[in-house]
Amino acid sequence: LSWNGKYLLDTYSSVTIPQVIEIIQTETQQKKTILKSENPLEKYAVGTTELIELKANDGTPLYAKMHKPKDFDPSKIYPVLVYVYGGPHAQLVTNSWLAGSYLWMPVFAHNQKYIVFTLDNRGSANRGFAFESGIHRQLGELEMEDQLTGINYLKTLPYVDSGQIAVHGWSFGGFMASSLMLRHPGVFSTAVAGGAVTNWAFYEVMYGERYMDTPQSNPNGYEKSRISNYVNNLKGKILFIHGSVDDVVVPQHVLTLMRTSVSQKQFFDFFLYPMHAHNVSGYDHVNLVQRILDYIVEHNVNKKYWK
């Protein structure tokens, strides 16, 4: 808004509109378009994007998005990658360019002939206090319930191979990916959990106790969400990735989980990025994305082919 209130600068995009910038006169509502972007991806092999509305078990609307190959054929069968965050303060599904996705998602969808699916579960941002607060003292419960609603929807689609569903997430999304894989064995063939919270008692107090209260006042909530309780449920393949100097989700999370997996004779894959904090940045980020996607393509195979 201009200093005198006469003009408004409006910038927007949608799933079908890359970007528009307009100047609007507040009194007359007259508009002048100063930028209308062409599709910068028109000539590239990038998948399509669509928005989906589902219903939670209690009837709450849930919003999701799906990327398909550019040459999608509904008569064919496709594997699925579910990209998840699921925590407070984040909204992954928006009616904006690419629906708010990272560019690698529709690129991966086309290049590897995948369906890439993301759903904003209860607890995520911009849906009001009631939508977020249901997760209080029980992180992971409603979130997984809603993510499984998304999985059940995917399984109704004739072009989805329900035996080839992988899940990936980072940070809270890493907590979600590992929880979904280990607490609902057999639903996913493969998981990649990056920077994952594995025990909320290890996490920073200002966040963990805001949503879980203290470990002393909510022992059942902390114990139920602790990933190491479920290591023997593994069916399929799971990769944990962590930065060696992560100061947000400290390495104690993943190292204690690895210790438990070894003691219980389970085989989790693990990769540590030396001298990286919570987010693997710079050129190494290219290595990270390639590592994640290669792992998914290699291991996300239909369960009927498992040895």
What are these regions (language model features)?
Residues L1-K307:
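Serine-hydrolase catalytic core recognition
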